[in-house]
Amino acid sequence: MNLEQSRKAIDEIDQQLVKLFTERMACAAEIAAYKKENNLPVLDAGRERQKLAAISEMAPDDLENSARCLYSLIFSLSRAYQHRLLGNDAELPKKIAAAIESTPSLFPPKAMVACQGVEGAYSQLACEKLFQAPNILYFSNFEAVFSAIEKGLCQYGIIPLENSTAGSVNKVYDLMLQHEFYIVRSTRLKVDHSLLVRPGTKLEDIREVYSHEQAIGQCQEFLKTLPNAQIIRCENTAQAAKFVAESGRNDVAALASRTCGALYGLTALAESVQDQGNNYTRFICISKNLEIYPGADRTSLRMVLAHKPGALYQVLSLFNALGINLNKLESRPIPERDFEFAFYFDLDTSIYSPAFLQLMAELPGICEQFSYLGSYSEVI
């Protein structure tokens, strides 16, 4: 058989496959009607396990895994189709619809907002980008910001999530696993670091440089020019600047913003010392309540998947099948569960699309743990 004959044979097989797939989905629709009438869940995990075992027996050894992957995707498509036929009558889509209905049309210009650090922190600058007149309450660390939201001390909290140079803020992702919250908005802030000192300090005098670990990671090349200086991490760039200002010493410096320099009376020995000129940090605005404002086009999710081959593939295949773009995937180890991870997903999708509603109905049933973290828009 030559190439053209082989391709023709494949075309004929594909015609049969599409016909059989259509017939299979028609059967799935009948099953959906039965499940609705008898108040049964769409997902029948036991039935799917039996089917996959049977498929494994039918497939030749060298195609067994491929056959299981194929049918896992078919099962996902079938469930999503059933959810759509049933009107996405699942709890999460209902919760999202209720939040859309109850959320005001405009993001609040004023609110009590929790920020980590002190006056001049980048979190403050991000907060002022999101709110016209925020009442900011400062906390010493990120965990305190999450706690302030959970306890109702503040309506919103501003948290840095990732940087274009240094990557994800791992400490924040780990805290996200421990706290209950929703993301209601995000923004990107251009981060420009200066080497700040007390007036009269010279570059050759510096023996200690203070800053947050993310800022230190963003300025590695510049710090190599200070081989005699000890690099000391602290909770916040603004706290570093405040410490230098109050230290009374002329052998210490801080990596922080020019805003901090002006605020604390410091001199910039060097400006824009970050490795990359386009250095941006993405901040999220969190709330205790689920609020979904008009224009929300990004959704964040957290999942703990079964510790078995193909579990992540099953989720990614569902995104692909529904035409939903994955913007970011992050994994973090789960405490006290060796080599098991929680996965964070950022998706680009309209909250009004049928595909989004199908996804929200489908995902909770295929995860060991599932958390919907919110749908929101990003302020540029």
Role assignments for model-derived ranges:
Residues 1-380:
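Domain-level signature for soluble enzymes in the chorismate/prephenate branch of the shikimate pathway
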